[in-house]
């Protein structure tokens, strides 16, 4: 028998029965016989055949396949050490960052990624000894480094709310502010705007989602917040027009950040 007893983004407590059947239990869950239960207070996430629970509080716990933003904190002979906001630092090996073979004796890895650089990577492996391996191969922007912009952190469990159904929330913020935004599943968000005011406005909207993610009508409130601030910026001459989404001010758009 295959059955799921909870909905995506449902708040659960330890011991909650999540599913029965041939599902794979991810982080924040445990299996007992044919059943999968929650081990933490958090929000349910269902990806294909994998069920996990994202804790409401605490540091980011990696899951293989997660797309994350990270900061280079050390450059070694054949790899980089990366901070992704997890309890343990991650590692990015040369072969997981570049397509071509390189001579490590003749190559300064700092010319690829240097300390302080922000990268966009995928969690390739996470084992029982807490070794986290990343890869930037196949990632947008070739994994980075991401130039300019600002890095904002939100609670990892709030990431699905920031993205919204079908990407609706994050795309509304991106369209109305004209900013480039990359959301990592570790709760790190990179924001790059056309000017400081629009970049700051996008960040304020992101932090508003983080603070109010548990409330009803959040999309409408964020939309009205953005439109109100954009009208002020237009009056001040900072912007010429207020962008349209789906043909009207502040409408929703679909897509993934």
Swiss-Prot record:
List the NCBIfam families: PRK04163.1-1
Superkingdom as given in the UniProt entry: Archaea
Q: Which residues form the KH domain?
A: 147-206
Gene Ontology BP annotations:
CUT catabolic process; exonucleolytic trimming to generate mature 3'-end of 5.8S rRNA from tricistronic rRNA transcript (SSU-rRNA, 5.8S rRNA, LSU-rRNA); poly(A)-dependent snoRNA 3'-end processing; RNA catabolic process; U4 snRNA 3'-end processing
The protein's GO terms of the molecular function aspect are: poly(A) binding; RNA binding
Q: Which family does it belong to?
A: Belongs to the RRP4 family.
Where in the cell is the protein located? Cytoplasm
The protein's assembly and partners: Component of the archaeal exosome complex. Forms a trimer of Rrp4 and/or Csl4 subunits. The trimer associates with a hexameric ring-like arrangement composed of 3 Rrp41-Rrp42 heterodimers.
Descriptive protein name: Exosome complex component Rrp4
GO CC terms, sorted = cytoplasm; exosome (RNase complex)
Identify the keywords attached in UniProt to this record, alphabetized.
Cytoplasm, Exosome, RNA-binding
Primary role: Non-catalytic component of the exosome, which is a complex involved in RNA degradation. Increases the RNA binding and the efficiency of RNA degradation. Confers strong poly(A) specificity to the exosome.
Keyword Cytoplasm annotated: yes
List, alphabetically, the Pfam families matched. ECR1_N_2 (PF22625), KH_6 (PF15985), RRP4_S1 (PF21266)
> Domain S1 motif: where?
65-137
Q: Which InterPro entries match?
A: Exosome_RNA_bind1/RRP40/RRP4, KH_dom, KH_dom_type_1, KH_dom_type_1_sf, NA-bd_OB-fold, Rrp4, RRP4_N, RRP4_S1
């Amino acid at each position: 028998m295959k059955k799921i007893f909870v909905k995506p983004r449902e708040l659960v407590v330890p011991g909650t029965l999540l599913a029965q059947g041939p599902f794979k239990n991810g982080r924040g869950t445990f299996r007992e016989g044919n059943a999968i239960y929650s081990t933490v207070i958090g929000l349910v996430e269902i990806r294909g055949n994998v069920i996990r629970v994202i804790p409401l509080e605490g540091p980011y716990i990696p899951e293989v396949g997660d797309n994350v933003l990270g900061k280079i904190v050390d450059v070694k002979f054949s790899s980089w050490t990366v901070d992704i906001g997890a309890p343990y630092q991650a590692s990015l090996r040369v072969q997981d960052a570049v397509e071509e073979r390189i001579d490590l004796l003749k190559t300064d890895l700092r010319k690829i990624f240097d300390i302080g650089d922000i990268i966009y990577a995928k969690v390739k492996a996470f084992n029982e000894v807490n070794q986290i391996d990343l890869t930037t191969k196949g990632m947008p922007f070739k994994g980075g480094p991401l130039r300019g912009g600002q890095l904002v952190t939100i609670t990892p469990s709030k990431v699905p709310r920031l993205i919204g159904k079908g990407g609706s929330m994050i795309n509304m913020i991106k369209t109305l502010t004209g900013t480039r935004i990359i959301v990592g599943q570790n709760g790190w968000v990179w924001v790059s705007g056309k000017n400081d005011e629009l970049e700051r406005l996008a960040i304020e909207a992101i932090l508003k989602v983080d603070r109010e993610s548990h409330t009803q009508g959040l999309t409408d409130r964020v939309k009205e917040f953005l439109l109100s601030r954009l009208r002020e910026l237009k009056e001040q001459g900072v912007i010429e027009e207020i962008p349209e989404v789906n043909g009207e001010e502040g409408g929703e758009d679909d897509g993934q950040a």
